[in-house]
Design a protein with these regions (language model features):
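Extracytoplasmic metal-acquisition and chelation regions
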Residues: 1-199
């Protein structure tokens, strides 16, 4: 038997668990709105904790005899997420209100949680930006003079160099949307945090 649990309406929270943020990216002359919603909720550890609470409630409904074990694991998870949140908050505080460009529109929840002054393009790290892409960047920089670009993966060396020639540093902040090749979510986030501190 398969059951679906709606995490947006968990009884243990007064507010909906996911604040849907439209995907917006700078594209050509105007901001182009992509269809759909931001999905990388786990980039906000506070939201991840709320979702974990909802999952614990759902699991307890399925297996009431395991409630104590579920609650113990939930407590451990919440503590780790709280520590991660504090670490990320301190790291992003070092940016202040410096403008940042995100290479891809997957950082909305991270941006909202930590007050990052960011705008998104739609560049892929493994694909060389087109002439049109570079024009879009120049237009974005007119009113958003960023000196830092955040990538979901390592950009091409030539792309990194061209950005550096324009005074823009590149840093990788993996969204961790898939199981990492090595380590776990927390190790990926710690690696991301260290990369940001170098920027």
């Amino acid at each position: 038997m398969t059951r679906l649990f709606d995490l947006d309406h968990a009884e243990r929270t007064a507010e909906p668990l996911s604040v849907r943020i439209p995907l917006q990216v700078a594209r050509h002359e105007a901001v182009h709105e992509h269809h759909g919603w931001a999905f990388t909720t786990w980039l906000d550890p506070q939201m991840a904790a709320l979702q974990a609470q909802a999952i614990a409630v759902a699991l307890t409904e399925l297996a009431p005899a395991s409630e104590v074990a579920f609650n113990q694991r939930l407590k451990e998870l919440e503590q780790r997420l709280q520590q991660l949140d504090r670490n990320l908050e301190a790291t992003f505080a070092t940016l202040g209100h410096r403008p940042v460009v995100f290479s891809h529109p997957v950082y909305q929840y991270l941006q909202a949680r930590y007050g990052i002054n960011g705008r998104s393009l739609h560049w892929e790290p493994e694909i060389a930006p087109s002439t049109r892409d570079w024009i879009d960047l120049q237009k974005l920089l007119i009113d958003h003079p960023a000196a830092l670009m955040v990538w979901e993966g390592e950009p091409l060396a030539d792309t990194r160099k061209k950005l550096a020639d324009q005074g823009i540093d590149s840093v990788v902040f993996e969204p961790a949307g898939n199981h990492p090749e090595g380590g776990d979510y927390y190790e990926v986030m710690e690696r991301n945090r260290r990369q940001l501190l170098k920027a």
